[in-house]
Amino acid sequence: MAAPNVRSSSSFSRNISVVSSPQIPGLKSGPNGTAFISSGIRDLDRILGGGYPLGSLVMVMEDPEAPHHMDLLRTYMSQGLVNNQPLLYASPSKDPKGFLGTLPHPASSKEDKPTAPDPDQGESLRIAWQYRKYLENQKNAIDDYSNDFDMRKPLERQFLSGRPIDCVSLLDSSDLSIAQDHCATFLSKFPRNSSNIASIGRIAIQSFCSPLCEYSEKESDMLSFIRLLKSMLMVSNAVAIVTFPPSLLSPSSSKRLQHMADTLLSIKAIPDGDKELEKLLTGYKDINGFLNIHKVARINTQVPVILEAKTFSMSLKKRRFLALECLNQAPVDGSSGTSYGTSGSCSSKSGALDF
């Protein structure tokens, strides 16, 4: 008599909740059961492999000479409000609600709806019309996930009125108990207890270590808060982005904060009047700053991310739309040689421009 076929179970098993096909706007499925929300910048979503994974902590290191971390916050918050996602915003300002008036508005899309082709024009034109319709359907699917934002146009009231927005002032706070209570209450609304995602939450904390807050001298309390926030995010359908100035922290505390981040970014100012850099980079006059990617979140996998580049230029296309581009080295001596990195691909070699 043949022995029964018994499957041996291992103590090491992958605990991955299967994410069903997203039915709510602003959510996209990824590999290994990962779900993404958009950063509000399409270039950044593409670079990060889809956006910010649900349950992840994003930290942005500020540069006092470049306030472009505010642009990352603005697009992130606007994207959530456009997709009707609840928002918790905390900042060291007396009136944090005033910051909502600076959020950018999604760009108006000028859609040229295709008209049915003339039957007398032949089969080739009919196929071309169907292909054009397919491309527009693909574009509409992208718009449901992410938008291009006009940085010069404020977000209209229709996206602010009646939306679940919680604003918290960290000014003159002696400790982080108020912020901790707000985060715990907010994240309790988005438990990750099933494969079906009903709603998504977004948390944005600006200048976490600002000297305007009394708790800024208690580095151990700040580390404990970030550790607790990350643990709550891991069991929630939410994402938190926290900006902080590393220069105001001790080197050890700054490193520990960076280590706790799932996705770690930094902003660098572009030097004013740097003639050498102007000769080195193409489009130098259009560059507002640099974005460095130090770490990319990896959820449900141990495979590391290999980026084509880690430093990108930040610029405003048409002086309105925030864009990220690989750094391109200008031809030497006016020759038409190959640049350091083309627009289609970025060099992985380290150079003087790696910050």
Curated annotation (Swiss-Prot):
Xref: Pfam families: PAXNEB (PF05625)
Location within or outside the cell: Cytoplasm; Nucleus
InterPro entries per the UniProt record, alphabetical: Elongator_complex_protein_4, P-loop_NTPase
Any single Gene Ontology cellular-component annotation: nucleus
Keyword tags: Abscisic acid signaling pathway, Auxin signaling pathway, Cytoplasm, Developmental protein, Nucleus, tRNA processing
Keyword Nucleus: yes
Residue ranges with Low complexity bias: 1-21
Tissue: Expressed in meristematic tissues of roots, leaves, stems, seedlings, cotyledons, flowers, siliques, guard cells, floral buds, and shoot apices.
Chief localization: cytoplasm
Pathway recorded for this protein: tRNA modification; 5-methoxycarbonylmethyl-2-thiouridine-tRNA biosynthesis
GO biological process: abscisic acid-activated signaling pathway; auxin-activated signaling pathway; cellular response to sucrose stimulus; negative regulation of anthocyanin metabolic process; positive regulation of cell population proliferation; regulation of auxin mediated signaling pathway; regulation of carbon utilization; regulation of leaf development
Location of region: Disordered: 1-32, 99-122, 334-355
CDD domains: Elp4
Result of knocking out the encoding gene: Narrow leaves and reduced root growth that results from a decreased cell division rate and a reduced apical dominance. Delayed germination after imbibition. Enhancement of germination and inhibition of leaf growth at high sucrose concentrations. Hypersensitive to abscisic acid (ABA) in seed germination and seedling growth. At the cellular level, hypotonic vacuole, alterations in the size of grana and starch grains in the chloroplasts, and massive presence of Golgi vesicles in the cytoplasm.
Database matches in PANTHER family: ELONGATOR COMPLEX PROTEIN 4, PAX6 NEIGHBOR PROTEIN PAXNEB
Record function comment: Component of the elongator complex which is required for multiple tRNA modifications, including mcm5U (5-methoxycarbonylmethyl uridine), mcm5s2U (5-methoxycarbonylmethyl-2-thiouridine), and ncm5U (5-carbamoylmethyl uridine). The elongator complex catalyzes the formation of carboxymethyluridine in the wobble base at position 34 in tRNAs. Promotes organ development by modulating cell division rate. May regulate mechanisms producing carbon assimilates or importing sucrose. Involved in the repression of the abscisic acid (ABA) signaling pathway during seed germination and seedling growth.
Oligomer status and interactors: Component of the elongator complex which consists of ELP1/ELO2, ELP2, ELP3/ELO3, ELP4/ELO1, ELP5, and ELP6. Interacts directly with ELP6.
Entry's family note: Belongs to the ELP4 family.
The protein's name in its UniProt record: Elongator complex protein 4
Organism, as annotated: Arabidopsis thaliana (Mouse-ear cress)
Taxon lineage: Eukaryota, Viridiplantae, Streptophyta, Embryophyta, Tracheophyta
